[in-house]
Amino acid sequence: MSTAREQPIFSTRAHVFQIDPATKRNWIPAGKHALTVSYFYDATRNVYRIISIGGAKAIINSTVTPNMTFTKTSQKFGQWADSRANTVYGLGFASEQHLTQFAEKFQEVKEAARLAREKSQDGGELTSPALGLASHQVPPSPLVSANGPGEEKLFRSQSADAPGPTERERLKKMLSEGSVGEVQWEAEFFALQDSNNKLAGALREANAAAAQWRQQLEAQRAEAERLRQRVAELEAQAASEVTPTGEKEGLGQGQSLEQLEALVQTKDQEIQTLKSQTGGPREALEAAEREETQQKVQDLETRNAELEHQLRAMERSLEEARAERERARAEVGRAAQLLDVSLFELSELREGLARLAEAAP
């Protein structure tokens, strides 16, 4: 394969569909995810191709010819018929802009294919494989659902001088438009289902986060209660500190007042000595411990307040997520109802059109 063919002229991402070969009416998706769709120039055969690879096989390998026509059937869906492959391809894009870019590039490539055919018939050679087409890569973007109808006879290319549509072609066109509406409703329904699944996942994550915050809050509250009890114990211990007092020994009536005074002075000295040795450091240590514990309690209370604030915020987010999920469910329900109505109307329309087609000469 040449270098010119290996480098795409233009690439984008889209959901790929093919017309059902049995019914020629319904679309068959090529996969659940969007695929890369590219324009290539085959220098060996001097042709332009639209190629899309899914896994190990080519989903699209369509040679662009001058008589092909790319038709926009909705804001995000387009299609073209490939007579060589005997099928109709449909592409669903993420936005109308992507569809417009692909359609414009289709026109450029078709014109380049026409010039290539003319030069080939004249015996000339093309010096530029892209005929002035600038390479352009469209960055991938998340795909929304796309849709389109299909009856191969309705998608054949038409030249500018083609005659106006006959009555039979007009009926077929009406039937094709009905199929467009059906596929559009189905695509919107699938898009709403995806949105609902995403909201459900976000709700589960929010519930898990809220449960985790509640566990942390309970642990912080238990720690704060334990520290409060410790502070109360230390305060009670400080209030009930036993002050050493001198024991009064039984004195006989024969002891003199001087001996009693000397004994009292001796005990006072012992008390002062004990206070200087043990009382001061212990009180200072207990005061420091109480101050540190109180600081921890204040820090924990501040942290608890922050956690409670965060918990309230998480609960508000949870309620918003639940409300959003309910809205999504309501939208899905409305879409399902509208789809049922549209399918019923489409069925009646098909029956009427079938009767008209049978009655037409």
Curated annotation (Swiss-Prot):
One of its GO terms (cellular component) is dendrite. One of its GO terms (molecular function) is protein domain specific binding. Residues 114-169 are annotated as: Disordered. Residues 191-243, 254-358 form a coiled coil. Residues 1-80 are annotated as: Required for interaction with NFATC2. It is found in: Cytoplasm; Postsynaptic density; Synapse. Residues 1-113 form the WH1 domain. The gene is HOMER3. One of its GO terms (biological process) is negative regulation of interleukin-2 production. Keywords: Coiled coil, Cytoplasm, Phosphoprotein, Synapse. Changing T36A: Does not affect interaction with NFATC2. Attenuates inhibition by AKT. Its main location: cytoplasm. The keyword Transcription regulation does not apply. This is Homer protein homolog 3. Tetramer. Isoform 1 and isoform 2 encode coiled-coil structures that mediate homo- and heteromultimerization. Interacts with NFATC2; interaction is calcium independent; interaction competes with PPP3CA for NFATC2 binding; interaction is reduced by AKT activation. Interacts with NFATC1 and NFATC4. Interacts with SHANK1; forms a high-order complex at least composed of SHANK1 and HOMER3; the complex formation is regulated by CAMK2A-mediated phosphorylation. CDD domains: EVH1_Homer_Vesl. Belongs to the Homer family. The WH1 domain interacts with the PPXXF motif in GRM1, GRM5, RYR1, RYR2, ITPR1, SHANK 1 and SHANK3. The modification Phosphoserine is found at S120, S159. InterPro entries: Homer, Homer_EVH1, PH-like_dom_sf, WH1/EVH1_dom. Postsynaptic density scaffolding protein. Binds and cross-links cytoplasmic regions of GRM1, GRM5, ITPR1, DNM3, RYR1, RYR2, SHANK1 and SHANK3. By physically linking GRM1 and GRM5 with ER-associated ITPR1 receptors, it aids the coupling of surface receptors to intracellular calcium release. Isoforms can be differently regulated and may play an important role in maintaining the plasticity at glutamatergic synapses. Negatively regulates T cell activation by inhibiting the calcineurin-NFAT pathway.
